[in-house]
Amino acid sequence: MTKTLPKDFIFGGATAAYQAEGATKTDGKGPVAWDKYLEDNYWYTAEPASDFYNRYPVDLKLAEEYNVNGIRISIAWSRVFPTGYGEVNRKGVEYYHNLFAECHKRGVEPFVTLHHFDTPEALHSNGDFLNRDNIDHFVAYAAFCFEEFPEVNYWTTFNEIGPIGDGQYLVGKFPPGIQYDLAKVFQSHHNMMVSHARAVKLYKDKGYKGEIGVVHALPTKYPYDPANPDDVRAAELEDIIHNKFILDATYLGRYSEKTMEGVQHILAANGGELDLREEDFSILEAAKDLNDFLGINYYMSDWMQAFDGETEIIHNGKGEKGSSKYQIKGVGRREAPVNVPKTDWDWIIYPQGLYDQIMRVKADYPNYKKIYITENGLGYKDEFVDGTVYDDGRIDYVKKHLEVISDAISDGANVKGYFIWSLMDVFSWSNGYEKRYGLFYVDFETQERYPKKSAHWYKKVAETQVID
């Protein structure tokens, strides 16, 4: 049976400042930790990315032509405050006014994120969100943006608090490149959630007319053998690290007893302790019912097996299928069932996981209000042939995820939109330019855009709301 989506459903495309804009030193933009980190550790940099800084009118015209009626954009904090606080860079501010005006001119609603992995270098090098001073700096930056950009109707505070802690302090593929420090992972999650709560409370206290929420990456975790209590426990603990800890902070305003028991178990095995203060919980509690929406980024699920050894994580950054490894002391290891498909980067393709995650949020956090799927898509080594890409694999991936969103809506979940990652090809944090996600192919040499087969398909789905 052909499935459909509601008439008012947003069919969006997602971007992020650092991954799309390029122009990393242009018009007074301050440095971010990624600038040097990429130069020192990777085979690529964020120049020129998709040159969105100059070419946004082209991308927004394409969005309009292909029925993409929403776009995720992030403001580069260091374009507005080059050192993270203090003096405002008016050229940066002007750029975003122009960008938002172009969005509205093209009928593409901007959903604007304040922080998408790009803390200004001056603040990142003094501890990023492990340093509580930076909570204050973030809230001041948020306050400035809320006041400066009344044309923005949809705000999100952070993109993917979970993967920031994970990338910076567990896997170590994000600056500062620290590995296996679970206490820092949880402390980063917590301090960023306090920052989020303070910004949301401020937005509501000031009476701004728009909506505000947060974007969480929520990869669903399953036990490898559901009949084995040790595998079930491994999945629960892995879920706490990546999902439950931050969801509790968002919607309960505290960490449930079960969540904290799991956190203590993980820290007992790995060392370290957390600094959780009474005033933190006051603000989390005050903000828990103020979120207007939840953004869910979903790409994959994981299966967890009991494991009794030392921590070892190998990140597959080059698309060499089967090269990744993930096992955490006191938690478990990832072990995928043989019949589940994977991408070249070992990301497990499992649309049912998105359905299960949406329904989990609905069941466990009934104050969620509404959901947007703020990122979902397929990274591929696209082959450019005859001026296009015949990306049937991407179409199939997106189709199956849209179908389970339709199912979730039928089953009572309030899901209002979907943003494909990504609108056009962008640079990928730990994979560079080889891993492409866009509806529009970008020739990074010439910066020309070419619609892929998926763009034509997505246009039709957006036009008809029929998933065909």
UniProtKB/Swiss-Prot annotation:
Entry's EC annotation: 3.2.1.85
Reaction catalysis annotation: a 6-phospho-beta-D-galactoside + H2O = D-galactose 6-phosphate + an alcohol
Keywords: Glycosidase, Hydrolase
Gene Ontology, cellular component aspect: cytosol
Domain of life: Bacteria
GO biological process: lactose catabolic process via tagatose-6-phosphate
Residues reported to bind D-galactose 6-phosphate: Q19, H116, N159, E160, N297, S428, W429, K435, Y437
UniProt xrefs under InterPro entries: 6P-beta-galactosidase (IPR005928), Glyco_hydro_1 (IPR001360), Glyco_hydro_1_AS (IPR018120), Glyco_hydro_1_N_CS (IPR033132), Glycoside_hydrolase_SF (IPR017853)
Active-site feature positions: E160 (proton donor), E375 (nucleophile)
Disulphide linkage map: none
GO MF annotation, one: 6-phospho-beta-galactosidase activity
Name the UniProt record assigns to this protein: 6-phospho-beta-galactosidase
Protein's gene: lacG
